[in-house]
Amino acid sequence: MQHKLLFSAIALALSYSAQAVIVPEGTQLDEKQHIVINNGAEPQSFDPQKTEGVPESAVAYQLLEGLVTSDSEGKLQPGVAESWENTPDFKTWTFHLRKDAKWSNGDPVTAHDFVFAWRRLVDPATAAPYASYLSYLQVENAQDIIDGKKKPAELGVEAKDDYTFVVHATNPVPYAVSLTTHQSLLPLPQKVVEKLGDAWVKKENYVGNGAYNWQTTLLTKKSNL
């Protein structure tokens, strides 16, 4: 089965990732499937924490899956997290991850990958455009880490075990779950990023957990009007 993602300024061929997608029982998929996304510019990067434009987010949501997703009507749906709950004061949110969620290299997607990604987001060394997003989410120590007053390891997130991700907020955030759909909060394959650094985002190194795998990239030479 083959999936393709096409752009007006860039053509990106993606293959179907069976590990990441849950297909409803009885659904018959075509042998070849295509998604066409009309972007106005070439994506700068496929690192979800180092980009901020629409072209990049359009790709990121195909290559990576977050804690929750939204359907065509904007309603929240389980992503890597199959369920979640909060304390009565809306300051602590616990996400229970699917044990069958896999990275495209076969490794399991764990709570540690989310902890790593969120810490990396607020780390000043990352220079992430949306670093302040975790401050908006009221995550403990987020702003102090961004300002260089505390270490990324002090961010208010934890992996209670491989499949339980916990977020601690300084103030009540009743809408926290909906905020986790943002591209900057997508997980990253910790082992791969730690080993390769910024080179992890190259096509030959890219590891995702979304519905598609990155295969080829082709810059267009002309426009068809």
Segment roles from a protein language model:
Residues 1-19:
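Gram-negative bacterial Sec-dependent N-terminal signal peptides
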Residues 22, 41-57, 80, 107, ...:
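A structural "hinge/loop" feature
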Residues 24-36, 107, 208:
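Immediate post-signal peptide segment of exported/extracytoplasmic ligand-binding proteins
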Residues 31-41, 82, 92-95, 114-117, ...:
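Short, well-ordered beta-strand elements
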Residues 38-88, 205-209:
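N-terminal lobe/hinge region of extracytoplasmic solute-binding protein
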Residues 83-130, 166:
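Aromatic- and charge-enriched surface segment that lines or borders ligand/interaction sites
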Residues 113-115, 122, 126-191:
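Surface-exposed binding/hinge segments that line
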Residues 172-225:
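Gly/Pro-rich hinge or "lid" segments in bacterial periplasmic/extracellular proteins
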